[in-house]
Each structure stands twice: as structure tokens, then as C-alpha cells.
């Protein structure tokens, strides 16, 4: 991995999670560029080289190791890495979904972004259709995407879901199913190794996984901070 070519990291954004994924990618690019600048300055100082010429040498080495025959990008400037995997999502009029990975992801660590509570109109089929998707639609879109990523040869699959779907169905009362646990088992059977989510209120969901790791992050402070900008919380 270099700061211009993150060879093992890729992001697949489901239609519902694309806006969120794009925000994350902006921050990732900023982090990569900052780290590269620090590395470039340190190497230039250590080997007594001009920083611009060193940048050109680094780009040259990157081009030498690139598998593509057609090299793109500036010769003497930093090249921002591309994390987003080219993916085509198809929505059929009967409600079915299809996901097709359009580039090689074999051996990569893939993070799939999905926001099941995104109820805005989402452009699908290349922008030809704009549809409001339900939670069930988002979940099914996520499942077919996981399967496509797995069959494309990804080394590791992680899910980034700000809202864990069906988290309301985490306790059994009478003759009812545990859908939150069921989804966890489906994810594991599809090869998911990690799930990153926010503020799961139930320990039962976290304990329902046999193999996959679940990272339950807390966003209470960030939410209150943003709310305080538009609502007076002191009264």
C-alpha cells in the first residue's frame, strides 16, 4: 500500500449509503494526503532531495508497479487515491435488485456502506429512476451486494451500517422471531467478518454473532453537538 495506491482497501457504496460513503471518502483522502506530505518532507530532508523531484520519483515508482497499461494522473503532483469501487446497481420494476462489481477486487478488504434509514429519493438504473426505498429494500440491496463482493473474490468483507436493521426485534416475547439475530447469521454465512454500526441499544444483538466482530460506536456527543447548532438545548 502507498499513499496514492491503497491496494488493499476498497469501498462499495450501496444506493442508500452512497452519500455517507462519499463523506467518509473525502476524509480518507484528506488523511492520506496529510500523511503523504509528512512522509515526503521526512524523506526529502533525510536524503537531501527536492520535494517536487521526490514526488516525481514516487509517482514513477507507482507507475512501474501499476498493473494497468494506460497510466493516469499527474507526473509531478500528488495523486489522490481512489477508494470507491466501480459498482452498478440495477433495480427491476418487480422490486428485485442486482449488484455488479465492475472492477477487480480480488484480495481486497472491502467495506460496504448502507444506510437502511435513508428514505430520500434515490437515483437508480443510472439515474433513470428515482425511488424511495423501504428498510426491507435497503436490506435486500445490501445482501445482494455482499454476495456480489464475495463472489468477486474479496479477501475480507466489512459492513458499515449506521443503523443496524431490525434492531427492534432483539428480544423474544412469546411466539415471535429474533430477526436481528437472524440477519446477523445471514451476514456471517455470506462471509462478513466485521460490522461497524452506531449505538446498538441491546447487548443481545452484539452477542448473536459467532464469527463476525461487531464494533458498536457511540455518536451521542456528535449528534448533540450538531443539534445544538440549530436548536437551543439549554432551555
Where are these regions (language model features)?
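PRPP-associated nucleotide enzymes
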Residues: 1-235
Amino acid at each position: 500500500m502507498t499513499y496514492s495506491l491503497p491496494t488493499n482497501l476498497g469501498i462499495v457504496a450501496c444506493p442508500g449509503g452512497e452519500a455517507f460513503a462519499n463523506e467518509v471518502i473525502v476524509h480518507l483522502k484528506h488523511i492520506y494526503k496529510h500523511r503523504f506530505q509528512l512522509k515526503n518532507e521526512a524523506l526529502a530532508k533525510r536524503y537531501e532531495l527536492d520535494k517536487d523531484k521526490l514526488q516525481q520519483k514516487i509517482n514513477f515508482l507507482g507507475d512501474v508497479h501499476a498493473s494497468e497499461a494506460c497510466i493516469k494522473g499527474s507526473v509531478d503532483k500528488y495523486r489522490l487515491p481512489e477508494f470507491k469501487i466501480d459498482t452498478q446497481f440495477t433495480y427491476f420494476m418487480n422490486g428485485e435488485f442486482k449488484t455488479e462489481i465492475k472492477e477487480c477486487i480480488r484480495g481486497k478488504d472491502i467495506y460496504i456502506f448502507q444506510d437502511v434509514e435513508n428514505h430520500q429519493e434515490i437515483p437508480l438504473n443510472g439515474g433513470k429512476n428515482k425511488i424511495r426505498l423501504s428498510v426491507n429494500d435497503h436490506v435486500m440491496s445490501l445482501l445482494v451486494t455482499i454476495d456480489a463482493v464475495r463472489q468477486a473474490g474479496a479477501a475480507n468483507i466489512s459492513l458499515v451500517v449506521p443503523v443496524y436493521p431490525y434492531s427492534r426485534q432483539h428480544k423474544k416475547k412469546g411466539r415471535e422471531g429474533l430477526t436481528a439475530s437472524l440477519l446477523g447469521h445471514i451476514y456471517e454465512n455470506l462471509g462478513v467478518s466485521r460490522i461497524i454500526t452506531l449505538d446498538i441499544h441491546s447487548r443481545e444483538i452484539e452477542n448473536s454473532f459467532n464469527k463476525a466482530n461487531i464494533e458498536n460506536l457511540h455518536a451521542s456527543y456528535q449528534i448533540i453537538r450538531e443539534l445544538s447548532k440549530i436548536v437551543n438545548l439549554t432551555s
